[in-house]
Amino acid sequence: METLVSSIFWTLAPWKNMLLLKHGRIEILDQNTMYGWYELPKQEFLSSKQPVQIFTTKKYWILFRIGPERRRKAGMPTGVYYIEFTR
């Protein structure tokens, strides 16, 4: 099974409570059911000097919380990953 780091390059800035997506695609669901796909093509990432901010939240994120068959078809990791923000 792939790890999150090998699939998507990301930077976490806990002092600002934000998740930064640098490359790849990610599906995000938080406790308030904010939900959606966000894509950043490789070329756009390579030409950009700054990471892209997706959302900010004080609650934790659940990444890739979709069915295993859909994850396999999309080439996404099959695990569920949690990132919890602390102050």
Swiss-Prot record:
InterPro entries xref list: Uncharacterised_Ycf15 (IPR019645)
Source species, domain of life: Eukaryota
Pfam families hit by this protein: Ycf15 (PF10705)
GO cellular component: chloroplast
Primary location class: plastid
Key word Plastid present: yes
Protein's cellular compartments: Plastid, Chloroplast
Keywords noted in UniProt: Chloroplast, Plastid
Family listed: Belongs to the ycf15 family.
Protein name: Putative uncharacterized protein ycf15
Species for this entry: Nicotiana tomentosiformis
Taxonomic lineage: Eukaryota, Viridiplantae, Streptophyta, Embryophyta, Tracheophyta
